[in-house]
């Protein structure tokens, strides 16, 4: 039986190995990022990301439609105005002239078609047409079913000094409908308060209209859901409920609304050889 020989091995110090005798190191995939090639790669990647981000945010933040903000704040149909109606913070206060004023003495008496010709009424300052025209072919943009102002079944005034463009349609405007209802209810209250209903508020037709307006305002109030906090009134050391004045609310810019309605507002003209929806004369409100 043979004898197993034992051999002792001694490690060679690294310093005694020649450079070409050392085992080659396996290249790492991260070696690409070292040296001038890695710098060039990272620089190119950074530039691509920057340019992509610039175009993305430029398209989404600075496009004409971006000024309308999120759909939570603006309806898609508002793009038909070609400019947004902004929101602004407003502290609401009592305007006693509207409390004391009577819409019967204003354009609201006949929805702008008549007035008593007396002293100016504060209600005249908030009267605007209930109807507007969109002349950028709203049906082609997904907002049709308005009153046609051109083509078959048109209700546009064919003798309007400003011809209607093809595809124009007329629509009511919610804010003016709601304001019309506020004035109608105020008229009915004043009629019963001062004349016992002799101005017509006690007719079945007018009572039905007032009921309709109350329902319109009920739903509009719930729709807008104003969550502004109202501070209570204080008398001495007691809190006595609240009247709602002096608190901040988030409101649409009324001046912007006025500009749009004056630009797009229309009136129904009948007589003098003309009939149909007609552009408002410039400067007329």
Swiss-Prot record:
Its main location: membrane. It is found in: Membrane. The keyword Oxidoreductase applies. GO terms for cellular component: membrane. Residues 143-165 are annotated as: Disordered. Its EC number is 1.-.-.-. Disruption phenotype: Abolishes the formation of phomopsin A and leads to the accumulation an intermediate with no modified Pro moiety. Keywords: Glycoprotein, Membrane, Oxidoreductase, Transmembrane, Transmembrane helix, Virulence. Glycans are attached at residue 202. A motif (HXXHC 2) lies at residues 209-213. A motif (HXXHC 1) lies at residues 177-181. The chain crosses the membrane at residues 32-54. PANTHER family: CYCLOCHLOROTINE BIOSYNTHESIS PROTEIN O, YALI0B05434P. The 2 HXXHC motifs are conserved in ustYa family proteins and might form active sites. UstYa family oxidase; part of the gene cluster that mediates the biosynthesis of the phomopsins, a group of hexapeptide mycotoxins which infects lupins and causes lupinosis disease in livestock. Within the pathway, phomYe catalyzes the desaturation of the Pro moiety into 3,4-dehydroproline (dPro). The pathway starts with the processing of the precursor phomA by several endopeptidases including kexin proteases as well as the cluster-specific S41 family peptidase phomP1 and the oligopeptidase phomG to produce 10 identical copies of the hexapeptide Tyr-Val-Ile-Pro-Ile-Asp. This is UstYa family oxidase phomYe. It comes from Diaporthe leptostromiformis (Lupinosis disease fungus). The lineage of its organism: Eukaryota, Fungi, Dikarya, Ascomycota, Pezizomycotina.
